[in-house]
Design a protein with these regions (language model features):
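Active-site entrance/lid segments in N-terminal catalytic domains of soluble metabolic enzymes
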Residues: 2-103
Length: 103
């Protein structure tokens, strides 16, 4: 049974074939990973903030912390991947590849 439902969206002037985008995370870390997601049907990707190669990337440690709130206890995990630690040149090469092969 064919399903011809149009899920495309226009977000701030950018057209997506569907509203499902990869987040800025390890799954969007390289052209190979992003290409696999596009081949699987994802509508887009949000990359990590790019680094100019001049800023040192420092990952916080420890990355987990216990939280005591009265009788309740919890665990918090820090987001340690807010900026790409890949060289800028590698990221730009990936963008060119993806733009050419997945316009």
């Amino acid at each position: 049974m064919a399903n011809n439902v149009d899920l495309s969206i226009d977000f701030c002037g950018v057209k997506f074939k569907n509203p499902f985008l990869l987040s800025s995370s390890p799954v969007s870390n390289s052209a190979e990973m992003v290409a696999k997601s596009f081949d699987a049907g994802w509508g887009g990707v949000v990359f990590k903030t790019l680094n100019s190669d001049r800023l040192p990337i420092v990952h916080p440690s420890p990355r987990m912390a216990c939280i005591d709130y009265g009788a309740k206890k919890g665990v918090a995990v820090q987001n340690v991947e807010m900026i790409s630690d890949r060289p800028l040149k590698d990221n730009l090469t990936d963008f060119l590849y993806l733009k050419k092969n997945y316009p």
